[in-house]
Amino acid sequence: METIGISRSKCGCFFSIWTVYRKLTLAHSSCTILSALGLRTMPATVVLGAQWGDEGKGKLVDRLAESATWVARFQGGNNAGHTVVLGDRVLKFHLLPSGITREECGLVLGDGMVIDPWVLDKELNDWVQGGGKDPSGKRLFISNRAHIILPYHTYIDGLDKKIGTTGRGIGPTYADKINRIGLRFADLPYCDFNEMAARQNKALEHAGCRQRVTAEELEEQISWIQNRFGSAITDTGILLDNALKMGDRIILEGAQGCLLDIDQGTFPFVTSSVTSRGNATHGAGIHPGHVDTVIGITKAYITRVGNGHMPTELFDEVGEHLTSVGHEFGTTTGRRRRCGWFDAVVMRHSNRVNGFTEIALTKLDVLGGLDEIKICVGYKMGDVEINEMPASAIALEDCQPVYVTMPGFASHSLEEWLGIARKCNSEGLGFSGLPAAAQNYIQKLESILGVTISSVGLGPDRDATVDRV
């Protein structure tokens, strides 16, 4: 079988295994003891978006990473956008796992990802300029099985606006992967630059793109990637497997959300990867038996960026309230997010696909100040009421939401919400320290979904989260 763009006339190796692990904390030393005794441990937590993305995964992963040894991404690329707020600092990541804020936490860009090396370099430089240390090859490792986004991928992606993609080259790179002509980090030493240039120019011409590439440009680009990231490229599946055998706690950080999943989302208005639980361990290079917790992240309302129908979308003053108070603009593109009431039909679908063991509810504070709050509990298609999402995006356009209505609660400033969260946690109040109407809203969601809500977000700050007690 012909392998396009790869020559076996060259050799090279970029394996770099982290041989010195940090001292194990008391939090996971018990897992290490169990492992040494030959007892089964499952020290992996999966964090997934349960809606159309932008649910607040970065903030949750940042909190969880405090007691984790590794945070690994397993799919997507720089089409993701994760935000972490540390005091006055607002950190926005597109490729780096959100655990980067924890200096003792190892970071992995896993097998299932597509990675733009130039974007990664800029993100690392921004991190260093902000006072951080460059983790490349020290605590940041790149899977040698991950595929590389090259400039021609972004040229092609910029031509198609019908789906409403981020234009970052994600789709074309995954297309090359499926067509078995993509370039992985493991293949960097074996590139045939003339053949690569010929193939890429043919693809550019076919797409109607004016740009062209040369073998010399490609050779320079590949050489730069090797020099910049060579020490970080390794078999991260082996690295994570060894860590799990030691009893280390690993967080598998999802990007986008279940409704953007290529198989389970609102096709064709989806991303190009599998964003759901089934791909978490596969895309990280470990087996699924390691997972003991699956956390679904959902806003207290719902948002969507790009094209495709959203049944509960609001075009009135309530929609404006959610947009302005929630600061609903995309981390990656800056695009205004469409806002709507919480959609339990979407969440039921997401839970069926992912099997959430718990739910983290974010941005409850944004609902403050509304006289009433609605929850979509079903859809009406003509005269028929349904409780599940239709597979067809066209059929979804015919769905009208069926609501239950609940009383609202008072608004507070972000500082006041932060104070409420800190009091709830420091005094062991849990959700009982929240406004009564907010408590009722949480209980109603749990009753509808049949899944426990383990935490509630009351603002962007790291401490503005109330944990269930």
Question: Which residues make up each language-model segment?
Answer:
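Cysteine-centered motifs
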Residues: C11-C13, C31
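Non-transmembrane, aqueous-exposed alpha-helical and coiled segments at domain scale
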Residues: M42-V469
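Short, positively charged and aromatic/hydrophobic N-terminal segments
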Residues: H28, T32-I33, G38
